[in-house]
């Protein structure tokens, strides 16, 4: 096992060096480009890379991030895949209507991304889900199982055993009674200290994490009125665990190829949540990395290599 990890790390390092050597010769299709689309009257920002006739890979971000979290992953995949990374409403560079103007629920986020993909002409695709990306992505998968070619879950939970004590500490009381006292507790999750903790806790070398990551996310959280958006989604998250059984049924019946690559030191989603995918799909690939919640920040090259190997075996 140690030898396997050594060779995987060496391959990831070589892959990173190879990317650097061709940076100046990068083709237009491999370059990440930046766009907006009008979806149901909202401006949806998205990043795009790779040939449009290549297999599609849709990257679905978590909280409190945006497509910014995929900025280094996309060029590592775009020679072989058409990669799309949208920002949800209320996140990143997409529009942020008030909760009175847009219902901030995971059903509605999935509706918006579904309509975005229809508009882009994306009929078949693989999904990469992280954190909030999981309830969005699994809604898409259960609505349109014929469209999903593969699932990559990076700390994107779909099992009760994946929920760490964090959920009981901050959210269960709020779900039961969203009064001002319980709301104030949840509001602590919108501070810079909390955002930094998500990025740095469980990392081997926190000094390798660029402060651009958590400061970019925090700037979004501190926009006027954004706290109301996030509180609405925190409250709606209570509707996700009751859907887990239907997601498991989808995995058992439709059998999409699954790659679970998780930071095993995540304070929010436990490794047991990654291991549980093997229960519903014994063929699923599992890789537990010695890092945290935002695993791309520390192990992006290795994750890219695992994705390339996984999709190369499963997508034709």
Language model features: what each stretch is:
Residues 10-21:
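Bacterial N-terminal signal peptides
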Residues 1-11:
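Bacterial N-terminal signal peptides that target proteins for export
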Residues 292-304:
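Catalytic histidine-centered segment of alpha/beta-hydrolase-like enzymes
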Residues 64, 89-92, 158, 292-295:
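Alpha/beta-hydrolase active-site loop signature
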Residues 59-62, 85:
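Structural cue for short, hydrophobic secondary-structure segments
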Residues 62-65, 131:
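Active-site glycine-rich loops that stabilize anionic/oxyanionic intermediates
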Residues 64-72, 83:
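Serine-hydrolase catalytic-loop signature spanning alpha/beta hydrolases and amidase-signature enzymes
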Residues 26-44, 49-56, 84, 91-128, ...:
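Flexible "cap/lid" subdomain of the alpha/beta-hydrolase fold that forms the substrate-access gate
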